[in-house]
UniProtKB/Swiss-Prot annotation:
Task of the protein: Protease with a carboxypeptidase B-like function involved in the C-terminal processing of the lysine and arginine residues from protein precursors. Promotes cell fusion and is involved in the programmed cell death.
Organism of derivation: Coprinopsis cinerea (strain Okayama-7 / 130 / ATCC MYA-4618 / FGSC 9003) (Inky cap fungus)
Signal sequence, renumbered to the chain: 1-23
Intervals, Lumenal compartment: 24-520
Region: Disordered, residue numbers: 551-618
Gene: KEX1
Protein known as: Pheromone-processing carboxypeptidase KEX1
Enzyme Commission number(s) of this protein: 3.4.16.6
The keyword Hydrolase belongs to this UniProt entry's keyword annotation: yes
Entry keyword Phosphoprotein: no
Amino acid sequence: MLSAIWTGFVTLFLCSFVQGAPADNVLPSAASFYVPSIPGIIPNPDYRLQIYAGHLPAESNKTLLASNDVTAHLYFVMVKNRRVADKERVVFWFNGGPGCSSFDGLMMEVGPWRWDGQPEGKESFIVKEGGWEEYTTMVFVDQPPGTGFSFTSTDQYAKTMKDAQWHILEFLRNFYQVFPEVLTMDTYLAGESFAGQWIPYFADAILESSLQIPLRGIAIGNGWMDARRQYLSYLDYSLKMGLIKDNSEDWKEVKAAHDRCEAHLEKLEGDPIHIRECGSIIMKVINQKRPDNEKGEKMCLNMYDVRFTDTSPACGLNWPPEMHAITHFLGRKDVVRALHAERHPGSWVECRRPVHRAFKDGEEESSITVLPRVLSKIPVLIFAGDQDLICNYVGLENMIKSLTWNGETGLGTVETQSWSVNSTATGTWVESRNLTYVKIFNASHMAPFDLPHVTHDMMLRFMGVNFSSIVGGSAMIPSSLGDAAKPVFVGGHLPQPSTPALPAGKTPEQDKAMWEAYYNAGSAALVLVLIMLVIGLFIWYRRRKSRLQLPSNQSGELAEESIPLRSEMEDRGGNGVSNGGAWKGKARASEPVFEVGDSDEDEPSPYRKPDGGGDRNV
């Protein structure tokens, strides 16, 4: 009796002080996601960053899961805008795959910092101009579950676009509960490569949902969207770019693969995302015979930037060179802790192959079938770096020519305009019936990596930013579209901005987040002390009671709590390159099968079932 009373007292005492694990429908506060600093990111006093990061559930609390399944969580990093133009805007950024982390976009393309060039182990990153966060809040999302720092059970990886749509809607539902102010911002989705599939499907789901998100447009860079046209573009692109010579032996091999693909497409129904029978075309292009390098290694064409070569069979998978430093950086425990990513066991990898393989099982219709429906509701930007082979501009232009939307096929008779940034010819620009197509000169598969200021200007124009309302930073870079030049104020004639640039130091919002975080940390420490005190008293009481009682002949053995998940993960270097070959890039160059999106090695999963069952389809 006394034991029961004591147990009840302890329970009530603990409940009065301890905030336990939140229920499925209880989310952490915004302050708990606040990132005051990141080790290895060299701050710039002129560019004050507000960063929030962490995991949010990507499943409804009504979802029926097995007892040993993990609730899917997506990981995000939000960088709030440093300056405000005419209105608040937010861009959700997605990289490709399937299974590739949006840290590619954050660390190398549209984020606020760049690698300093130091070797792996000594790397740091410098905050500098060119990031899209200057005038726009950026949210980088690792999806589907299992990608980057996101996690789920291995048998719960997304298998279809519907799975991925559902996860992103649940994530957004929770995201807006934590950050309700973002729901009032003009919203855009952007990304590249296989995000050409994700983004139209996500936009369609958002527009049909009850979330009431003010989605104003989507932007896709060098996207994989229309397999029928894009596979058949490799021959034409290679000839235009001088990668092969007409009627040469190389041309004959590429042409034979092209003809086999074309014959297969004539019999094929529907618009699938991948067509295995067509994958050999690009392999014929990149694997033309070339002289060995000085180390005697075989060389091939970089499929993401045809200005470069790479060792075989990587053929671009070793590019960009920043990836090794980024992978090492994101493997540091202090960085993982600062980014609130500890819940993800094991090392970060750029692209996770089991996620990639699980998704490919579905018989999926390409996003080209969804795009006309999206175009009937919101503007769409398709941009293409002209040095990319794998998702080249020729294929995208052929796609647009054959696409029917808003009552017509193709762009029609609209005029293509010249576009320049900083007095340099940058590309061409054309708009028709909600579709904007931009070809960017001297840019690769990752156009923002090559030309950050150029792609930033492009995005500001697409979002309709009033250039007269912004000053400082990129506002000082001249640009023009056709005959219309962006207003640039110089000398002593700068007007007062509609909303001034954010000053150095912390804003009231940051101070609030910081003090709330301190308060939570102090409260947690106090609670921990009280818990230890109560537990100590309880143990003392139990030991004293056991000395006064007769020994029990009942077995005191307790079944160990069933732990449904195993958290081991082999560390194979974390660089996305397996012992058996190169897997870093957006395709598997060792196989004659075209796949947009990186794939890492077959690593043991952190969420493997306790019966020893392996990853699905691995």
